[in-house]
């Protein structure tokens, strides 16, 4: 079992990704795909007159502030355009993919966090009306049912709160939770960079390996969204996942390349 998370940033080759996944699936590889959609969500939000707002926590993590209107735009893009676009690509390759959000069947479940602390102009502010959370429970029964029935699950945020409310969750950490719950042998975090870079954005500064015992040392070099990927990797290896790879989703055969060790390998 492997779990593949593909980001939603510009430059990602979804056609190559889906072609690669289809070949692996047809060869018998059990797999769950988790995806994002940040760039398209930003574009649609701007077009609808509700531009995205990002906040930085006191610990340095950046996330999307998700008020109710933002959540509705988020669902429209992630669950609609992005999810069905990926499912359609896989179906064209003969894979019976099934697109679901974490809200469906409570596949992903966690605690709703109504407020978030944000550093603005050097001061810490508390912003209320946030619809975010962290995945604490994965419905593995439903995922295993789908897999055993021949369906390839294509998952995306939002998740469900314990009260049944939709919450925005970080996709990388959600994928780590899925990989842990399914006891995956590998978690592949694919994005629009070749891996963790020692000197971002210099792609020649790729860090090839990080010991599993010292994953969080990667936070020293992680910039912006990569910080959440490193955090997700740490959670995955702590949960028993065999290895995590930060790989490049812009190249041909990105999944097999990551499985072969191209990128940053955490093991």
Model regions: which residues?
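C-terminal catalytic "cap/lid" subdomain
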Residues: 2-62, 66-267
């Amino acid at each position: 079992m492997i779990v593949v998370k593909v980001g939603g940033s510009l430059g990602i080759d979804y056609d190559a990704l889906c072609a690669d996944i289809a070949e692996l699936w047809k060869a018998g590889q059990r797999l769950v795909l988790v995806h994002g959609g940040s760039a398209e969500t930003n574009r649609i939000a701007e077009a609808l007159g509700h531009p995205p707002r990002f906040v930085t926590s006191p610990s340095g993590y950046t996330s999307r502030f998700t008020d109710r209107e933002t959540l509705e735009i988020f669902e429209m893009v992630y669950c609609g355009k992005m999810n069905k676009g990926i499912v359609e690509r896989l179906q064209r390759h003969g894979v019976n993919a099934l697109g679901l959000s974490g809200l469906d069947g409570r596949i992903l479940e966690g605690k709703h966090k109504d407020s978030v602390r944000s550093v603005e102009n050097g001061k810490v502010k508390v912003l209320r009306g946030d619809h975010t959370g962290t995945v604490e429970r994965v419905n593995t029964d439903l995922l295993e049912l789908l897999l055993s029935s021949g369906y390839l699950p294509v998952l995306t945020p939002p998740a469900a709160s314990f009260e049944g409310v939709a919450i925005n969750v970080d996709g990388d950490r959600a994928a780590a939770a899925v990989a842990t719950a399914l006891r995956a042998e590998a978690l592949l975090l694919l994005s629009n960079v070749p891996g963790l870079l020692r000197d971002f954005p210099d792609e020649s500064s790729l860090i090839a390996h990080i010991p599993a015992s010292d994953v969080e040392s990667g936070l020293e070099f992680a910039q912006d969204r990569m910080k959440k990927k490193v955090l997700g990797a740490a959670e995955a290896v702590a949960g028993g996942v065999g290895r995590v790879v930060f790989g490049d989703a812009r190249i041909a055969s990105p999944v097999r390349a990551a499985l072969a060790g191209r990128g940053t390998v955490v093991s």
